[in-house]
Structures are given as C-alpha cells and as structure tokens.
C-alpha cells in the first residue's frame, strides 16, 4: 500500500514538473503532457484516497506488529547482503539510520502505544510517506546490489540503474526525515483549526 501511494504521489509530482518543463506549451494538447497529468490525477484518489489509506495503514496494518517485524527482518537480511558491497557502504549506513527512525516512528504512532489519538491521526500521512520513501530506498539498495553483481554482463544498463539509485539516495530520500519531524511535532495546531 505505501509503495502504491508513493508512486501515485510521485506520479503527480513528475507530470506536474513535465508541464512546467514544457512551459505554456506543456499545458496544451499538442504534446500530451496535459493528458498524462489528467490521467495521473485520479491515481491518488483510487481506493479511497491516499489519506484514507494512510489512516487504514496506521490503525489497522501497523497495529498488527507481526507484519512490521517480518518486514524489518527482511530489510535486515538485505542490509547484510549489501554491506558486503563496498560501493554501497554509504547507502547501507543511511538506510540503517532510517530503519532506526522508522522503528521509533512506528512505536510512536502505534495505536497500541501512549501517543494521543489526535497526534496519531494527524500524522498518518507523514508516516505513510516516510514508510514509502523508506521502502523505495530499500528497493533501490537491492537493485543497486544486483547491478554491481551483474555490471559486466550489461555495463551501460546497470550503470544507468546505479546512477538512478544514487540520485534517489541523494535527492529524493532526504525528504523522508522531514515527514518524521512533522509528525512528531504533534497535532496541537492541526486540531485547533476552526472551520466556520
């Protein structure tokens, strides 16, 4: 679920950027970018919107600790495999740090814990986004390990994979921590909003 939501959010971001790249011309029907944007716009709404999915993820899925624990064991195994590849040491260190943050974040947001329910509810979107960025970093780490293992078989193809993975770690993944910081700030101002 968190991967699907991450892709739908990123799809919106990417098609929006594509319109911007084309300038006013991207807004016309000539290039098809506006159609891609319109087609993409529905994806965050499918299955009850990403925000509803975030609430469901936290209150139903994450509260079942076993699923989270099994996923973390799987991540640990891949981290061990990747730590044997010298070129991935920096990324292994980063994903290990984020794994610790994700564990703390999960304990904090767990409906079974001590965090007030309003704080949890106000933080579901941030948790889902953090989890999505983390999962994508895990997938990129695994992809990069496989790319290094097969580099000589198809150098150009795997170098592109490695470059894209490095880009993700350097330019996209740092967004994750902002969602953690936003979430743990609580819900005081979110819940004090008055709608007249």
Regions found by a protein language model. Name each.
Residues 32, 44-78, 144-147:
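Acidic, Mg2+-coordinating active-site segments of isoprenoid diphosphate-utilizing enzymes
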Residues 12-15, 30, 39, 51-55, ...:
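Alpha-helix initiation and N-capping motif
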Residues 19-21, 33, 111-115:
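Short linear motifs at secondary-structure transitions and domain/linker junctions
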Residues 5-6, 24-31, 45-49, 62-66, ...:
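Alpha-helix capping and helix-loop boundary segments enriched in small/acidic/polar residues
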Residues 9-28, 36-59, 128-138:
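Conserved phosphate/anionic-ligand binding catalytic regions in large, soluble enzymes, centered on
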Residues 1-3:
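Short, small-residue-biased leader/transition segments that mark boundaries at the very start
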Residues 15, 19-28, 67-72, 80, ...:
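Acidic/polar loop patches that form or flank catalytic/metal-binding clefts of enzymes
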Residues 74, 78-196:
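C-terminal amphipathic alpha-helical interaction region
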């Amino acid at each position: 679920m968190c991967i699907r939501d991450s892709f739908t959010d990123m799809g919106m971001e990417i098609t929006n950027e594509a319109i911007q790249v084309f300038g006013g011309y991207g807004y016309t029907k000539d290039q098809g970018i506006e159609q891609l944007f319109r087609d993409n716009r529905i994806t965050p709404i499918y299955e009850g919107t990403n925000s509803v999915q975030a609430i469901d993820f936290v209150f139903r899925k994450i509260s079942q600790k076993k699923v989270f624990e099994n996923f973390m064991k799987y991540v640990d195994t891949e981290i061990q495999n990747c730590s044997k590849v010298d070129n991935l040491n920096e990324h292994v260190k980063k994903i290990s740090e984020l794994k610790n943050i994700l564990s703390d974040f999960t304990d904090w947001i767990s409906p079974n814990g001590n965090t007030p329910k309003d704080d949890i509810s106000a933080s579901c979107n941030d948790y889902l986004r953090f989890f999505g960025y983390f999962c994508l970093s895990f997938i990129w780490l695994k992809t990069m390990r496989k790319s290094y293992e097969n580099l000589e078989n198809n150098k150009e193809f795997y170098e592109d994979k490695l470059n894209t993975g490095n880009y993700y770690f350097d330019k996209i993944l740092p967004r994750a921590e902002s969602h953690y910081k936003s979430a743990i700030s609580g819900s005081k101002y979110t819940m004090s909003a008055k709608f007249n």
